[in-house]
Amino acid sequence: MSSVEGMAQSIRSGTEPVRVQWLGRIDYQAAWDLQRELAEERIAGGPDSLLLLEHPEVYTAGRRTLAHERPVDGTPVIDTDRGGKITWHGPGQLVGYPIIGLAEPLDVVNFVRRLEESLISVCASFGVQTGRVEGRSGVWVAGDGGRPDRKIAAIGIRVARATTLHGFAINCDCDLGAFGSIVPCGIADAGVTSLTAELGRTVGVAEVIDRVSEAVLDALDGRIALGVASSPGVDSAQ
């Protein structure tokens, strides 16, 4: 697990408050279309946005996804332009899409690390100790008692014209069995977990939303110290 750096400056180019929207459960394609609309608005001088939502069940593949990592049962997959590999979205998983104009000089890896740090702090607020794993993006519960490292939150983004799209997903009380048909995030030697699985009680999306929103905004604006680790899962098209 990572050591900690000091506080950072805001990574946003703008100073206006981030517009936070809770969309409820929304189709993946509809949310993707909305992201692109908001990104164009941001590029034209509009506000930063943070979309929080759930998706109906869907598999999405990042640009680095390999053929053998896709569902073995032929389940449809939406191919996306984000970084990272294949993952699952569905009910019980809180998804966040920050549409943010990044400050110069662009530091995309630092942006990803801020998202990771925000989710680490959210997990800690529930009493779940998490951190980073060197060379692997996302947020992890360390292996214990014969169990492997377990991913509790995934991150995959794209940056185009200094503006971010896609984002993160944290498992609250989702069906972890849905990950069984794929190699989640291309990592075959690790597991997947959720807040509910780690705590032994139901932790629904509604209980997590406000904590995630606050932590992400704090991390983007430098109010949360950053740990030290590399962060793959980035696709940059400046």
Swiss-Prot record:
GO terms for molecular function: lipoyl(octanoyl) transferase activity. The record marks K151 as: Lowers pKa of active site Cys. Residues 44-224 form the BPL/LPL catalytic domain. The active site is at C185 (acyl-thioester intermediate). Its main location: cytoplasm. One of its GO terms (cellular component) is cytoplasm. In the reaction, the free carboxyl group of octanoic acid is attached via an amide linkage to the epsilon-amino group of a specific lysine residue of lipoyl domains of lipoate-dependent enzymes. Belongs to the LipB family. Catalyzes the transfer of endogenously produced octanoic acid from octanoyl-acyl-carrier-protein onto the lipoyl domains of lipoate-dependent enzymes. Lipoyl-ACP can also act as a substrate although octanoyl-ACP is likely to be the physiological substrate. This is Octanoyltransferase.
